[in-house]
C-alpha cells in the first residue's frame, strides 16, 4: 500500500512526551490509538529506527510518519442536514450545530459530522482512521465554524497554517465574572487531568496553550468575550477561563457544580463565530462568520435584560 511520508522535528515544548501522544498532537487528523497502531506496525520511526509508543521524544529528534494512504472509508454515509457555508475542490467550511459530535468514537458511532460529510462529499477519503478530512475539532456542545479538507493538498495546506499559527479561530463566549482590563492573554500549559480522564487541566508539564481575549460587552456579573486561539489544545478555552475563575456560562464540566443561573442554557456558552485561513488552491485569504444560534442569542438577551 502506498504511504504518505511526514517528517517532524521535535520542538522544545514537546520534551518528554510519549511518542504516540506527540504524533497525535502534531498530525491533526490522526488519533492517539491510530498513532499507537502505526508505531507498533513499524510505520512511525524515531531517529530512523523502530520505537515503542511509550518512548519519550526529545528536542531535535526526527519523527518519521509513514502512513498508509487512506483508502475509501468503511464509515456509513448518512443524510444528515449540514450547513455548508463554503466549498471548493480542497476544503469545506461547515457551521456545526451544538449537540453534534465531530467524528465517530465509542458511544457515538453514527450521527456525527463525519457521517454527514460522507453523504454530502463522498470524495472525502483523506485521513484514514475514523476522521476523514477532519483537521480540527469542536466539542460536541460547542457550535460554529470548522474547516474540513477534501484531499491531501487541502490537508497539508491547512495543517501547515495550523502549525504556523496563521489561521484565525475566534469564539464568542460568556463567562461568569468581570475583567479589569479590556483585553488579555492566558498563557498556561494544558494536559490531561491527573485523575479525571474526561477533563483537561493546567499543568506545569503540559503542552503550551495560549488564548487571547477581548471584552465585547459588560453584562453585570457576566462578560461577553471574544476568545482567539493561538494554540488548539483540547477544551482550551473552557479550561483557561475556569483556571482564571471565570468559567464559561453553562459549562457542565469546568463550571461550578451549582451555577448561580443558567439563563435557559443546556450547554456552555461557546460559539466558533469567526474562521479565517488561506485557500490551498490560490493562497487568497478568506474569512467566514457565523451568527449566534438561537439558544445562545436568547441567553444573551436575558443577560442584557438583567444587567445594570
Residue ranges and their predicted role:
Residues 1-308:
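RNA pseudouridine synthases
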